[in-house]
From Swiss-Prot:
Alphabetized PROSITE patterns for the sequence: LON_N, LON_PROTEOLYTIC, LON_SER
NCBIfam families: lon (TIGR00763)
Gene label: pim1
Function statement: ATP-dependent serine protease that mediates the selective degradation of misfolded, unassembled or oxidatively damaged polypeptides as well as certain short-lived regulatory proteins in the mitochondrial matrix. May also have a chaperone function in the assembly of inner membrane protein complexes. Participates in the regulation of mitochondrial gene expression and in the maintenance of the integrity of the mitochondrial genome. Binds to mitochondrial DNA in a site-specific manner.
Alphabetic keyword roster: ATP-binding, DNA-binding, Hydrolase, Mitochondrion, Nucleotide-binding, Protease, Serine protease, Transit peptide
Active site: 990, 1033
Name this protein carries in UniProt: Lon protease homolog, mitochondrial
Length: 1113
């Protein structure tokens, strides 16, 4: 607008900016009630003097001015427009003054303020005239459009964005302005009245709420996210009609801002006033509205959002022509429509919101002096006091509620007290709604008391939990506080030196007791000097301290006194293990050499054998025999080199390797370190641990072993290393070359019997509580266990089976004795009874404030062992063994009593020891001159064994061609060779002579002796080569009923080393060539008959002549 230009006041009003005045909103507490501050702020806001601000609801639309304006003369209209323009210019400043919380008037330099005493007197006179005009108009009209008003304790509507103020409209205007009496004359404009809450509001916008209902007199902030509902609320605030109905969702998980169906909400809610509304942070359309409920209402009908929007489109033109009118703020005029057709929420029909027709609910009359009401009221007050003593927040809410709602006695307002009790409680949804719906005070008070009692229980539980937690941490905090005070006092008195100096002295004392080498001593002094100059808060301080701790933990120069007694060593080794002659002899040799030299050096031994033969346990026995400290660690599956040689000190949490840790634990330089499962060591991206063992297990290098963490040479030459492995194939060759191998073979039946009787059975009896009971496991039963249940090389499974037998026996004895032999209360010792009584007291004590100590609750109560009568006896024999361990797992190894042609018995070595391996050969098709030769091989044979079968087939054909040339069996025979137990993989070269013998037996049609077993590798020229596992194979042959065993001549030394108890009853035959095997197996063979055995089948049959007869001519 150009300077000096004047506009009509209606046009100027459109350009006036209408600032939004938000009210402060406190975060809603869990009780959903207002705090004292928000109530005081609302009262202060209502008491502030405010200037008049134009409301859009009090001005007619400019498209159709009221008839009063058309009758005014042009001069008067121009003067009035000028005055209204001034009023518009002052309105924003007046509103800013009204929002000022200080309540002071603006200074003289503010825009719109009077600049002289004359102007102020003129403004006052104008205000007086306007006030007198308003009083006269109200007397003439009699009935205003607004309602009759509510009690004085209800809050007045808050003017927002041009809403009406609570003061008269002409308070700060001049006498000639629009709000004065002169401007009122003949204008038809409606004067503004003091706002009040209408008692009758038949139609309101319904807002659904979740979780908790609203109660009259208690504020609650709600969040509106629906943009249409938010826009409708903003429009209501602008028009000065901030009234809504709040109704609770029946489903506590429901959400939304629009009611689609009346069945979704309860029909009883509250008529609430929006006291403040402001946009949500981070959202463009949502608002947060603060509601103040005034009274209870009930829904009579719902106008759904779709119908409301449709109705809004048809009534839009009518609303535009008629204008927007605030029923509770303005007086009616002659131009308005009849009162009975007027609806104050008609402007909301253009929004898709929920409109409901409601009716007020009035409380039923009650007698304040009723005994029931007084008693329940008194109980509610008492419960509130109890909750206030437990919850400080609740105490503040009670104080604010009492100050605002009860100027007099509490018993005078039982209805409000019941609403307060329900509003502050955290009850169930249906319980809270039931309190809201009850109009009978005598019924409402007990319901509210029940809800409040639940809140008291919650408060008591919270208080108890808080006290329990506080009791747990109070003692620790007190000790920490006292210790800190003590440290400070000692530091001030000089009694205690600095912790760093004390640490340095401790390291020096440790180092003086050790015989550190010069190189190590130098490093120690350097690190100790660095520690003395470091601050304790520095990160390097902890690293240096830990390093010095490890340096002083290694036993430099500390050795254990070794025992060189041969007899003592033999006694100790025989106590723990039966057999293992090779290992025991090697240890005795080690002791003898040390006794002759006066000192011993470290050795690296490697015990190789099947599982369960005692490799790991013999290491502990060796340490006890030599009086050395024992340390064991397994490298099976190890893939990190740092486990052997440690981590660099630069890493966080770095530690030395296992070897340095072993020295720290043993505290000697000459311990026995057992490295278990060395054949199963792994390899990963972090290095190859087997390569790291090369330095460790090399007698020439381990005198200066260098750990990555220690970074100083450590002497390991006096350490006795014992490694264990099942096989040597997976051990790297350089590492295997550094160790002295001692092979341990599996136990035979006699050795297992001795081990079971000497070690396993007594240990199992003690473990199962049968040490003092007469339970006898016969020798025949143990033999049956070994033969039919436990055929493995070791004795682990035998130990399990014997323990199983004794466990079954213990169960049988207790079951037969019955439960009355020793009563439960008599089974406890004196100590156990004391513990039981103490636990019962702690359990039954109602005043226990802390939970039971977990250590006491998990401690086993001492009990008296059951005394079995001496008359109880139990003998477990071979026949009754199945009752304890079930049916036998292994049957007899002997598959044939007599061998048919083509069947032979070989011998094999398995992880469970030796086993009989049968080879079967058959003729697939009948021999004819036209048949084609070939061989099929089955039995899950692996590569090496398949090659042996091919060699045996070729060698058998060679033997037949040389010794039986007329026997053309292999030229025409289609053969099938099979090894039984096809589910078991089979491999190895030692079945060569067995396969060749099977083929020759079939070709010669000659059965073999079933008491002869054989093993040996065969070459194509007939040479028999060396095999392994002769001990186990011999045991298997004896178990299968063999009387003779054929083995290679190169294994003669192994045969001679076998104990006599193994070779007893078996005749050994060493062979170097297969011809010796042939002569031994086919002694009674008729070579002439064998040469022609298949001649009939292979003979050419003569062709039949034709029946045609030649005729003579």
């Amino acid at each position: 607008m150009l300077r000096g230009q004047t506009l009509p006041w209606r046009a100027a009003l459109q350009q006036v900016s209408r600032p939004f005045i938000p009210r402060p909103l406190l975060a809603p507490s869990r009780y959903n009630v207002t705090a004292r501050s928000i109530l005081n702020a609302s009262r202060l806001h209502r008491s502030l003097p405010t200037s008049r601000a134009f409301s859009s609801s009090s001005i007619r639309r400019r498209e159709k001015p009221p008839p009063g304006d058309e009758k005014d003369d042009p001069a008067q209209k121009e003067q009035k427009d000028a005055n209204e323009e001034k009023d518009v210019e002052r309105a924003p400043d007046a509103r800013r003054k009204a929002a000022d919380p200080s309540g002071k008037q603006g200074s003289s330099h503010e825009p719109g303020a009077p600049t002289s005493g004359f102007a102020r007197r003129k403004e006052k006179a104008g205000a007086d005239k306007e006030q007198r005009g308003l009083e006269e108009d109200s007397k003439k009209d009699g009935n205003a459009v607004e309602g009759k008003g509510n009690s004085s304790d209800t809050p007045s509507p808050i003017p927002v964005n041009g809403g009406s103020d609570s003061r008269p409209s002409g308070a700060n205007n001049g006498g000639n302005e629009d709000g004065g009496k002169k401007g009122k004359k003949g204008s038809g404009e409606k004067a503004l009245q003091k706002p009040s809450v209408p008692e009758v509001y038949p139609q309101v916008m319904a807002i659904p709420i979740a979780k908790r209902p609203l109660f009259p007199g208690f504020y609650k902030a709600i969040t509106i996210r629906d943009p249409n509902v938010a826009a409708a609320i903003q429009d209501m605030m602008k028009r000065g009609q901030p009234y809504v109905g709040a109704f609770l969702f029946k489903d506590e998980n429901a959400d939304g801002d629009v009611i689609e169906n009346l069945d979704d909400v309860y029909d009883v809610g509250v008529f609430a006033q929006i006291t403040a509304a402001y946009p949500l942070r981070g959202e463009a359309s949502g608002v947060t509205a603060v509601l103040y409920p005034h009274r209870r209402i009930k829904v009579s009908s719902l106008l759904p959002p779709s119908d409301a929007a449709k109705a809004g489109t048809t009534d839009e033109k009518t609303s535009e022509r008629r204008g927007d009118v605030v029923a509770s703020f303005e007086e009616g005029t002659a131009e308005l429509a009849p009162k009975d057709h007027y609806e104050p929420t008609s402007f909301l029909r253009k929004y898709p919101v929920s409109l409901v027709n409601v009716e007020n609910l009035a409380e039923e009359p009650y007698d304040k002096k009723s005994a029931i009401i007084r008693a329940v009221t008194s109980e509610i007050v008492n419960v509130c006091k109890e909750i206030a003593s437990l919850n400080p927040l609740f105490r503040d809410q009670i104080s604010a509620f009492y100050t605002d709602q009860f100027p007099g006695n509490l018993s005078d307002e039982p209805a409000k007290l019941a609403d307060f009790a329900a509003a502050v409680s955290a009850g169930e949804l249906n319980e809270m709604q039931e309190v809201l719906e009850l109009m009978n005070i005598e019924e409402r008070l007990p319901k509210a008391l029940v809800v409040l009692k639940k809140e008291l229980m919650n408060a008591q539980l919270q208080s108890k939990i808080s006290k329990d937690v506080e009791a747990k941490i109070q003692k620790r905090q007190r000790e920490y506080w006292l210790m800190e005070q003590m440290k400070g006092i000692k530091r001030e008195l000089g009694i205690e030196s600095d912790g760093k100096d004390k640490l340095v002295e401790k390291f020096k004392e440790k180092a003086e007791k050790l015989a550190m080498p010069d190189a190590v001593k130098k490093v120690f002094d350097e690190e100790l000097n660095k520690l003395a100059h470091l601050e304790p808060a520095a990160s390097e301080f902890n690293v240096t301290r830990n390093y010095l701790d490890w340096l002083t933990q290694i036993p430099w120069g500390q050795k254990s006194v070794e025992n060189f007694g041969i007899q003592h060593a033999v006694k100790v080794l025989d106590e723990d293990h039966y057999g293992l002659k090779d290992v025991k002899d090697r240890i005795l040799e080690f002791i003898a050499v040390g006794k002759l030299r006066g000192t011993v050096e470290g050795k690296i031994l490697c015990l190789v054998g099947p599982p369960g033969v005692g490799k790991t346990s013999i290491g502990k026995s060796i340490a006890r025999a030599l009086n050395r400290q024992y340390y064991r660690f397994s490298v099976g599956g190890l893939t990190d080199v740092a486990e052997i040689k440690g981590h660099r000190r630069t890493y966080v949490g770095a530690l030395p390797g296992r070897i340095i840790q072993a020295l720290k634990k043993c505290q000697t330089e000459n311990p026995l370190i057992l490295i278990d499962e060395i054949d199963k060591i792994g390899r990963g991206h972090q290095g190859d641990p087997s390569s790291a063992l090369l330095e460790l297990l090399d007698p020439e290098q381990n005198s200066s072993f260098l750990d990555h963490y220690m970074d100083v040479p450590v002497d390991l030459s006096k350490v006795l290393f014992v490694c264990t492995a099942n096989v040597t194939d997976t051990i790297p060759r350089p590492l295997l070359d550094r160790m002295e191998l001692i092979e341990l073979s599996g136990y035979v039946a006699d050795e297992k019997m001795a081990i079971a009787q000497r070690y396993l059975a007594p240990a199992a009896r003690e473990l199962t509580g049968l040490k003092e009971v007469d339970v006898n496991l016969t020798e025949e039963a143990v033999e049956e266990l070994i033969k039919s249940y436990c055929r493995e090389s070791g004795v682990r499974n035998l130990k399990k089976q014997i323990e199983k037998v004794y466990r079954k026996a213990a169960y049988k004895i207790v079951r037969d004795l019955g439960e009355d032999v020793l009563a439960e209360e008599k089974a406890l010792t004196d100590e156990g009874k004391a513990v039981q009584e103490e636990s019962q007291k702690e359990t039954e004590s109602p005043d226990s404030k802390s939970p039971v100590d977990p250590e006491k609750s998990t401690t086993e109560t001492p009990r008296v062992a059951l005394k079995v009568p001496e008359s109880v006896q139990l003998s477990i024999g071979k026949d009754s063994l199945t009752d304890y361990v079930g049916p036998p797992i292994f049957t007899a190894d002997r598959l044939y009593d007599t061998f048919p042609p083509g069947v032979t018995m070989g011998l094999a070595w398995t992880s469970m020891g030796g086993a009989a391996l049968y080879v079967e050969s058959i003729l697939e098709n009948a021999l004819t001159p036209q048949s084609r030769p070939g061989i099929d091989i089955t039995g899950n044979l692996q590569n090496v064994m398949k090659e042996s079968s091919q060699i045996a087939y070729s060698f058998a054909k060679s033997v037949m061609a040389k010794q039986f040339p007329e026997n053309r069996f292999f030229e025409k025979a289609k053969l099938h060779m099979h090894c039984p137990e096809g589910a078991v993989p089979k491999d190895g070269p030692s079945a060569g002579i067995t396969m060749a013998t099977s083929l020759l037996s079939l070709a010669l049609n000659h059965p073999l002796d079933p008491t002869i077993a054989m093993t040996g590798e065969l070459t194509v020229t007939g040479k028999v080569l060396r095999i392994g596992g002769l001990r186990e194979k011999t045991v298997a042959a004896r178990r299968a009923g063999a009387k003779k065993i054929v083995f290679p001549a190169d294994n003669m030394s192994d045969w001679l080393e076998l104990p006599e108890n193994i070779k007893e009853g078996i005749e050994g035959h060493a062979v170097g060539w297969y011809s010796e095997v042939f002569d031994l197996l086919f002694t009674d063979l008729d070579k002439g008959a064998a040469n022609h055995v298949w001649q009939k089948q292979l003979a050419e049959k003569p062709e039949k002549k034709s029946n045609e007869v030649e005729e003579d001519e």
